[in-house]
């Protein structure tokens, strides 16, 4: 019953919330985002020079672009260009505890896009903007909508944007590698030395001082949820069941089937859409559906898995995938930052699939 930071595994939950609104007729996937968030109507596009070297959007950012990370938005932690730096300076890197999503989105929309909408795949705060759209479409704060339409119906009792005081003792600490240490060498002895190397991990965030202990008013649809493996397992089982669990219908069967199709232009993989410095998956042979990656070609992806498997992960090395062909869902939770520290996802996938013998 340990509670962990699921970070970007929040994105799939937020996308399901948006698709609930879609089924209710609130929007169409190719609607301009600016129709609902007018601040994005005049958001310029960076041309590659100084921050003010910009041009107008040639076509508008759409809701589909947000769900597929082809919106032109970015993350400040990429640290690859002046737009990333502007995100950090404006406090856009990760929604914090103060203010509201509406205020945060207005600050974001004042900064340039890194490319024309639809032109590139770039990991970004798109799901946070999508969370704000859920608020606009539903007329409810994102936390209230998630609780009423996903968390409560699925009995995800320990999932939310903060950990209740009664559960503070269940919140895990989060760790990171020490500078220069390799996870492969933790506890090993250096050649010619009888002394083990120093531990390869340090405390990244103690549970006693975690920001997730305090309530927030700024609900990050891209990375703000905490929860348990039981809770997220129920969410994945709902997806595997094509929208239903224990009599609770969250989405229609055809909606879930549509979400897990590759939505990138011309059925391209992520490698063909650009390769940013950060992703929760590899690029070759991997497309992107609505809210998660989708395996197009296992050989190109260099993974012993099924075409059609869909997945995502979180910054603290958490991961999930759903394989409709094999009728399995997998959830793995740990607390190790960043997710590139150790190739646990690749090893876990090999362990799971080698166990399928009939």
Predicted regions mapped to residue ranges:
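Short, surface-exposed loop or secondary-structure junction motifs
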Residues: 43-304
